């Protein structure tokens, strides 16, 4: 079974760390990336040159899979969640995908429901997130499924857009069952698909691309 990986904060120095954390150097950052590339046999590792990163795009069956890197390029300034180069790359990849579904993964949550301004798009780069979501919406890029992690537990959310379009996020779970925030909250009732916390869990997409209108279940 092919395994495709990404890192999050505890793989990248420590809790909520990104870019070059205080007390570390560029050499340390390169070392973290080097160990990662030696540990995971991914299809690519970012720019594959001195610019670094570990993002990539691949294909699993009929589906495109895009994994972004929201740790390496952050500078501590708003708008640096992916960095300019990776953002341009992501926009190109989204428009080049040809499968019925695009699984787009980010190690932190796409929505703000659980993160509440913590180590998230909502805190560091809401403008960049809006660029991505608006591109998907205006270019009518079909079948985008958002997956995420970071916060302990497994939750699914509908992300409504101003024009009535919806994106769907699947926080993929905590295999180790570490307790985190509540799986459900009353204020999420209109947007939440499911919620699990304080137990073992994993997530799985089942895709049937043989139909005239391909289907996915989660």
Set out the residue ranges of the language-model regions:
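Metal-dependent phosphoester/phosphodiester hydrolase catalytic core
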Residues: 1-218
